[in-house]
């Protein structure tokens, strides 16, 4: 989300519309204006289902994936935090936090296989990080506690990272069969909740930067968002 694109209009009645993650975050007028962060499979995990036949795609992850991106006064990204609450996936289950900052990438969780899979195959390919440097993630083994509530917000902490979101502005459903990651189209459905307030602490210090808010009163958008009831198929 350092520079942004405008997405195609997309909603439940047009599930095949192409989706741009970055445009989703920025555009509140379209249902896709959500800042979606979720896990999707790399090409190697997509199975034999053709990109053009969503009916043959199989679930690869079920869970929740809130996200937070902060910006400085010039609009540059100062931090990107991807919180994962994975109920089931092809690489296991558990809670993970992936933190991107200009000085490197930190992954926190109890299962390095799951944490590094999420970081290397998915987060690094998200358009939010287009044009930003990506380094080999540093894995920090630690329990991650996640409390997500579509009524009130999020608290996630572990491995020196503490993320809070509050003031849920909206709750809306989203679905598409055309969400590309690493050159492979995926199907995605979820419930999205943009948040009006958020902050991140890293090793006890408040992470610099502010969230970006936009959209319309009917469809607000924010770079701090909840994403629940999330299912990815590939």
Question: Positions of the model-derived regions?
Answer:
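Targeting-peptide/extracellular-domain and disordered-appendage signature
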Residues: 2-15, 24-35, 46-234
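N-terminal signal peptide c-region/cleavage motif recognized by signal peptidases
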Residues: 40-41
């Amino acid at each position: 989300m350092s520079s942004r694109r405008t997405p195609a209009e997309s909603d439940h009645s047009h599930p095949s519309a192409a989706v741009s993650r970055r445009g989703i975050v920025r555009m509140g007028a379209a249902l896709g204006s959500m800042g979606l962060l979720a896990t999707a499979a790399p090409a190697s995990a997509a199975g034999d289902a053709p990109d053009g036949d969503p009916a043959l795609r199989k679930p690869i992850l079920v869970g929740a994936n809130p996200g937070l991106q902060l910006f400085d006064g010039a609009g540059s990204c100062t931090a990107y935090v991807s919180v994962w609450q994975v109920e089931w996936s092809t690489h296991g289950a558990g809670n993970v936090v992936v933190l991107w900052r200009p000085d490197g990438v930190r992954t926190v969780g109890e299962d390095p296989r799951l944490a590094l899979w999420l970081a290397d195959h998915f987060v690094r390919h998200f358009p939010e990080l287009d044009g930003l440097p990506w380094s080999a993630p540093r894995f920090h083994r630690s329990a991650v506690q996640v409390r997500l509530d579509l009524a009130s917000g999020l608290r996630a902490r572990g491995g020196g990272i503490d993320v809070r979101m509050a003031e849920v502005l909206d709750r809306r459903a989203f679905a598409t069969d055309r969400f590309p990651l690493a050159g492979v189209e995926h199907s995605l459905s979820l419930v999205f909740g943009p948040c009006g307030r958020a902050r991140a602490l890293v090793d006890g210090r408040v992470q610099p930067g502010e969230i970006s808010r936009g959209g319309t009163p009917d469809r607000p958008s924010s770079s701090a968002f909840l994403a629940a009831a999330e299912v990815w198929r590939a």
